[in-house]
């Protein structure tokens, strides 16, 4: 447990996470100061009166006078104001670092470009099925500090690369990097390896490292060691086994579950299930209750979620596909009887869209591209693409064209912030329009 008495603490970024940091310090007799680049940040009205605040920008004077800065994952450590504070010797951490200094129960830590929310939730469900008092959150749901409780027996945290950059005290009982594909390249000027290095921090003091046998970028820098357990499609300690048209989850050669007993579908979800099982096994959760959780878990909203099935047409909301790798996961091995009507677009965050090209072949696919990077996406295969300003225009364009056996898939490969509040709002709009047009 760290001692923050008489420390001059500055919190950057409000919202739910920022407020959880404020509460954390107030409970320890320390009154922090808060700043946010937004003029009216969310949660401003919930900030206790005694907490000094500075909005609409950063206050360099406060930062340089601080003993400790707690930075929101939304602000880059490379920001000139933070660089100056770091150079002046000010300690800069995030909420996850504060959490790790206090947590008494084992931590399962999950990161990766795609699938981390599903795997985090699944491991949480496995723990609940075993009757374990578990706190699930971090980059999903509740901020980590709101989970702290002396009665907890386990924590399951989803961690982003930004959160890991400011964390040094994490000693996970089990940690995984599910996959590494381009994302947030606007925050990583040195490219994929810089982004990967942030993700790999999760392994630093971990007891067990769960790695993806199909993705060498998920391996610790020094290579797999005796701490490593692997999962993969065909390779790995935890893998898939296909026999006579049936697919099984297998652990070290032993069949443990037929995927038809699971509510989740799609190869990417089967590998998510393998990763979750490996993590649950690593922290000693009973296998039987973990498998039971796999048969009841229905998946998360906006993640390859069936929004509507009507007149033989399936409308799928995969709005959470905010990067290229996530859309690749949706398209890989996808079976459609008729034509796939694929909605792509939004803010691509400087990503390279070319890996999608291999999935856009044949004559049973149509592209509808919208938003800031719509033109770039339409250029992947112009002869089957139509570009519109908004997603709604695209959906009104495609609706009269769909036939029984077709699929309409929103898997945009882009962030939503150019036209929507967040990916949830984008998914909700898609679902509403699907019900209206389908």
Curated annotation (Swiss-Prot):
ATP binds at residues 112-118. Keywords: ATP-binding, Cell cycle, Cell division, Cell shape, Cell wall biogenesis/degradation, Cytoplasm, Ligase, Nucleotide-binding, Peptidoglycan synthesis. One of its GO terms (biological process) is cell division. Disulfide bonds: none annotated. GO terms for molecular function: ATP binding; UDP-N-acetylmuramoylalanine-D-glutamate ligase activity. NCBIfam families: murD. Cell wall formation. Catalyzes the addition of glutamate to the nucleotide precursor UDP-N-acetylmuramoyl-L-alanine (UMA). This is UDP-N-acetylmuramoylalanine--D-glutamate ligase. It comes from Salmonella typhimurium (strain LT2 / SGSC1412 / ATCC 700720). The gene is murD.
